[in-house]
Each structure stands twice: as structure tokens, then as C-alpha cells.
From Swiss-Prot:
Purpose: This protein may play a role in the biosynthesis of the prosthetic group of nitrogenase (FeMo cofactor).
Pathway it works in: Cofactor biosynthesis; Fe-Mo cofactor biosynthesis
Family, as annotated: Belongs to the NifD/NifK/NifE/NifN family.
InterPro entries cross-referenced by the UniProt entry: Nase/OxRdtase_comp1, Nase_comp1_CS, NifE, NifE-like
GO BP annotation list: nitrogen fixation; protein-containing complex assembly
Lineage: Archaea, Methanobacteriati, Methanobacteriota, Methanomada group, Methanococci
Protein name: Nitrogenase iron-molybdenum cofactor biosynthesis protein NifE
Organism: Methanococcus maripaludis
Any Pfam family: Oxidored_nitro
Annotated region described as Disordered, given as residue ranges: 1-20
Keyword annotations from UniProtKB, A to Z: Nitrogen fixation
Amino acid sequence: MVLNLDTENRKMQDGNNDDDFDLEVQIPNSIFEKLKSIEALKARESPMCVSGKDDSIPTCDQNSTPGMITQRSCVYGGARVVLMPITDAVHLVHGPIGCAACTWDIRGSKSTGDKLYKNGFSTDLQEKDIVFGGEKKLYESILEVNKLYHPGAIFVYSTCVVGLIGDDLKAVCRQAQEATGCRVIPVQSEGFKSFNKTAGHKLACDAMLDYVIGTEEPEEEHPYSINIIGEFNVAGDLWGIIPLYEKMGVKVHTAITGDSTVAKVASAHRSKLNIVQCPKSSNYLAAQMDKKYGIPSFKVNFFGLDETTKSLRAVAEFFGDEEMIKRTEELIKSEIKNLRDEISEYQKDLSGRTVAIYSGAHKSWALVSAFGELDMEIIMSGTQNGKPEDYQQIRDHVCEGTLIVDDASSMELVQLLKEYKPDILISGAKEKYLSLKSGIPHCDFNHDRITAFSGYQGFINFARVVHTAVMTPIWRLSRKMMI
């Protein structure tokens, strides 16, 4: 099957009439010709579109198309990535060993203190447990890990199998908490609850709201204290943000959940402001904390110089302290001045280069400004689990003619890369090797990366990694061999 993106089809899908449909006037026909050459299942036509003057977005937030191999994660995986960075907690997976194995250290989060979260724990359900139930095994497992590790809390994750056999997770956790005196927190994250792992993010946030946040008081209250929500300290990202706010005179009480502890999250309700780095995973949490504790929130973005600057200024303006505002402007001026020369060197080689992004919904549009500062052009942007509002953000940030795609399979991505020939693909580890095998340089921006990309210094690190990937001589040789 070949993608059919002719004018009539687009009119039918978007609901546009002849008077307001003028997409082809704005976008070169060559863009549509590229898409028409991509082989795909017929049901996969509408999850791809080209940004233009109309308001069309890909069909999204639906079950994956039968017959294609999706790269999506499950609800359990969505819950796991939100809670795992709590450093002094045990994360116990109630299910088969494979569920724990495939999510072990899934976030790549770093810690300044406890490393307990780096361990993987599972009840390792077997066939007999499926027949007779796994509640006793779960109870004994909780008692054992508490005796061995004395954690700040034990998060117990439900998986698909547990949902099918009907183990009462909440009852077992309640009994185990009474027996141990340790917080034992059920996370009802059966993987089959939704096709979108974002449901798992919400379940993880509910677990924190119901059992952790608001249960302790901070050691001291600061007049300018904030929580950074949706920041998971991947590769140490958080450590490029906190020092900036400290220089402004702002106290970062905790990130939720990067490099956090149970006690810090428990006392987060006393902070004066929540700033949200990843709205996909944490908008819900910020909204609920506002509703329950009266903590206002707004979105920030620490990827790129301009976005980092806006995020610092927004916090200073929120508190309205004149001295803080003055310090913030001096800090911004100093930080950018120190980086201009190095950025210019990278721009010389990267200017005009093209980029494809296939990553989380937030990063798929949040990186647009950062690449603009390197004078690079985004020609494709997509995600596995985007919702309509995510694709509207992408559409609003990218240039006309940019391909926007939802839930692409490996086959489709390979064809898109070969057809569009970007100078680099920004994605996660799942797409890394298909990109490299296609002769396309790759930059890992997801959980497996080892370099911090947030804040001013993080942007320099990012520019360096992108520059190294694009300018490596092997690509000139490999492309000649592939022709």
C-alpha cells in the first residue's frame, strides 16, 4: 500500500472545503511526492501530515494499527519512568520477571545520594502463581526487601498479569505497611489499561498525591522555594538548572522526581511555585497540587539558550523581588557572554543542516528553538504517544512543509529517513541503530544518554554532541558506499 496524500483525501480527512483549502500553494509539491513514495498500511495514511497554513494534525491518540510493529511503551512503563528516580525508594514490580527486566534503570537518572533506586526488584510470578494467586508472594517480598534495605518507601507496581488474576494490590500493601512501618504504595499500572503510556504517568502522579505529597513538613520554609516538576535528572540535567536558580536567590526544594527522596517529595506541598519541565508527564500533578494546596504553576523549557533565559526570568518575575530580577539579568548576561564564541564555532559547520526528531511529545517541539539557535532546520518531527494538543504545539513551532508523524513503525522510519535524508536524527535508543544503518547520524536525547543537555552549559554539550555526530568523516564514506 502506498500513502495517498492527494488533495481530495486531505480535504476529506481535515474537513476543509474548497474555499479554505490552499495547502499546495504554500508547500512545494516535492514534499507531497516524498510522502507518496512511502509504503505503509492504508490505515497509516492519516497519522502523517505536512505542516502548512491549515490546522491539520496527524490522526493520533488511538490504538496502534493492527499489523504494524509499534514502538510504544505500556501503562506500567509510563508509571515506572515517573517514579523510578526517587532515589531512596524500592521499586517492586509485581509480575513476571520480564516486566522488571525491561524497565530496570529505564530513566538513566543520576543521584547525589542514595542509589537504592538503581536496583531492580520483582515478585517473579510463575504459572502456579497465576493459578493460585500472587498475594502471599507479594506480601513476603515486601517484608523481605524492607528487612534488607530499610527504604524510604516501597512502590509496588501492578502489571498485566496481576490485573488478569485479580490480586488485591491495595489490601496487600496496606497489610505490609502495618507489619513493617514503611510506606508501601500501590501503583495500579496494569499495562493493558490504555494504549497510551501517558495513562501510566497519571497513575504515578496519583500514587504520589494519595500516599506521599503532603504527609511531611519541610525542615525549613523558604520564601522563594520552588519545585521543578517533570524533571527526572537524566544524565544529570537537573544539576545544570539548580545552580542557576540558587544564584538568583531561589530555593529549589525538590525536583519531582529527579534526584529526589521520599521526604522531599512528601514535603513538596509547602513550596511557593511549581515549574513544569515535562508537561506530558506532569501537567496533571501540577494542576492537582494547585487544586489541593494552592500552589501555582507554569511551564518552562531548559533546552536552548533562549528557552532557558525565559524560564529563569519567568520565576524572577513571578516572585517580583527587584533584587532577584536584577541578579537574574546579570546572571543571564554573564552566562550567554561566556558561551557565544563556542556556539559560533559550532554554527559554522551546522548552519543549514536538516534535522529529524522522533522522541517524546514534549521534546518533539521543545527542541525547535534550540536547533534554531544552531541555524539548523527541522524537516520531520514525530512521537509515539502524542495527543492532539502535542501535535498542535509541534505544528505551531515548526516551519511550513515539516512532516509530522504519529506512532511510526521501524519500517516507516527507515523509509522516511531514506526519503528525507536529514543530516541527523534526534531520538532514543530504539531508533539509534536503524538510523545509523541508514547512514544517518544520530543523537540520543532520551533516557539512555550520558550527557546533560539542560541549561546554558547543557546547550553547549548538546551542540558539541550534534556537531560531533554530523561532522564525523565516516558518514561521507558510508553514503558513497550506499549509492
